[in-house]
Amino acid sequence: MAAHAAAAPADTPVPAPVPASEARAGKDTDPAVRVLPTVDVSGSANAGWRARSASVTGRDDASILDTPASVTVVSAARIADQQARTLADVLRNDASINADYTPVGYYGNFTIRGFPLDPASAIRLDGLTLSGEQNVALENKERVEILKGLAAIDSGVLSPGGIVNFVSKRPENVSSVTAGVDSRGSTSAAVDLGRRFGPDKQFGFRINAAKENLHSYVDDANGRRSFASLAADWNITPRASLQVNAEFQQWIQRSVSGYQLLGGTVVPPAASASKLLGVQPWAKPVTTDALNLNARFDYAFNDDWRAYVTGGRSRTMIDDNVAFAYGCAYVPSCGAGGTSPFFFASNGDFDVYDYRSPGEYRRNDEVRAALAGKFSTGALRHDVLFGVGALHRVVRLSTSVYDYVGSENIYGPDLSFDPSPNSASQSYPQLDAWQVSLFASDKISLGEHWQVLAGGRQVLLRQRAWTSQDGEPTRTDRSKFLPQLALVYKPAAPLTFYGSYSKDLSLGDQAPVRASNAYAFLPPLESNAYEVGAKYDWANRLTLTAAAFTISKPFEFAQPDSTDAGYTFVQRGRERHDGIELGASGRLTERLSLNATLAAIRARAYDSGTPAYEGHQVINVPALRATLNADYAVPGLPGFDLLGGLEYSASRTANEEGSARVPGWIVVNAGARYSTKLGGHRVTARLWVDNLFNRYYWRDAGELQGDAYLFIGAPRTARFSVTYDF
């Protein structure tokens, strides 16, 4: 109930895919014809998993090696090899990213460098902000880009952790069908169909569609989804191009409640990964309808100057239903030992609530225009970007049903209760927010070895927020200049050192229902980020990265006090995260490609006025995390690759006081890919096994709206798919 209560293939003898830019332009097309903007993910036939460029920083096709920020790119090929179904699966490739309340059957929430991502602003599609309250489909995505820490120059109001950007596949001549199955009985089918046509191949379209029957490892939590998308391109002239994208997905699945600490201090021992807490026969599934639209027009004035205008709409409609397991206020055992009613009782008793919130409506409308150019002033070379953007965010919610219906025990049998007789009210506006930003940056080259990046954005935020249907809105008006500065030193072409500073503005959180100021929106808060790093391109085959960072922002938490509620949600003190990241991505040998990441983060709260919340790691942020994924082309077996993965997480705190911890864990994944030709058509079979050794572990100890929840990781699951190109 989230807002409920309260690959580029590795080196093999198989020919590598034609880079997207070549596939669209065609080797025999007029070289003067300008094709639509692209990002080279695979780089060359032997580049393995090494991305060369990304657009998530706000500059199209920016070289990752020369960018003074930490960027991760996960290609469509790796997504396919790992049989990823959701963003949560994709983000497991980076150690700096963690699940932060990601229940089965609902959209996921995540942290980057320990800071929660705001789904209203930190999730993007083709550079435009999505309504992130959705599980974005992956069938039509060319790659997923992650920017850590430093915000993109064209961002508006944004959480300090970073940005996740989905990049859509562009039209090219492609025809393929994919069928898949997993060991739990899930089945899926997908089609990918694209063509370029016209006298100069100036027109193009690409259609993706998918249907999936979802069988969860949690009992009674099965579901289904349907997806369709269209991408269209038009190279209007050699200098002008237009692209349009539309996608729709419906996801219907029962949502799974998380466990809570027993007595507020103990991680539930021997808890079942397959038990649907509070399951009731009358509980309906959650239905999420997501529609994402965008368009972009590019115009090149000459080789040095170009402009673009882009805009989009992202809309989600959620019928949120769940028999929600929460707290123990209605059971006698709750008072034993002074247990807070906001946790499960010490013996495992918990309350069940009939929660219904139909017609949750969230919409992001965004438009942006920018001018980019290059010029020289004496010995200085300038690469400039100027732009303006506007984002309108609308949220409408109903007065939900949230009624107690009975109590159960996590170790006991499932019990049936009568649903609440009450009905939800009609929806009302909860949020109406405008963000307008002016941004500019100049990358100045000082000779051959030094670059200075200076820029910033002026952000105007105007927001109205309602806490009840009949109440007066809380108004927020804020104007702030947010600078970005970076210094880059390149002693040699393959080596980059950098240091950067940025200031960001993010929206304040909403107080949880249990606080004395329930539902109140806290004011916007400013964060500061410092980062130094190094990047090395070894032998044009392996990219090595290292970064150290410090990010701080006001600490938001439910502060114990003498009010009737016992807590007030406040901003007080600072929360600072200091960390080191290491990474390696690319081709280690002629046959072995890998992606390895490591993140060590020290996350602390200071000057909060609540000593129990200080002096230890912030909730759900592991001090050390690492990932390793590899692709090995087996000699003597053309087209056959062995795949493997490893994820490690240190233990993490599970409550604000730091008195409870979930243990660390190691999960091993394995798979294989075989690609051959049958009758002149490419056929690719993929096998991937998550959690190969069936490790029992707590994958998520996240906090939502002031309450802490625990989710058990999925047991061993095998997925198999076959793709046929025709």
Task: Give short role names for the model-derived ranges.
Residues E212-S216, S229-N235, R239-A300, R313-R362, ...:
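Acidic/polar loop-and-plug regions of large Gram-negative outer-membrane beta-barrel proteins
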Residues E360, V384, Y530, I619-F726:
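Conserved C-terminal beta-signal and adjacent last beta-strands/turns
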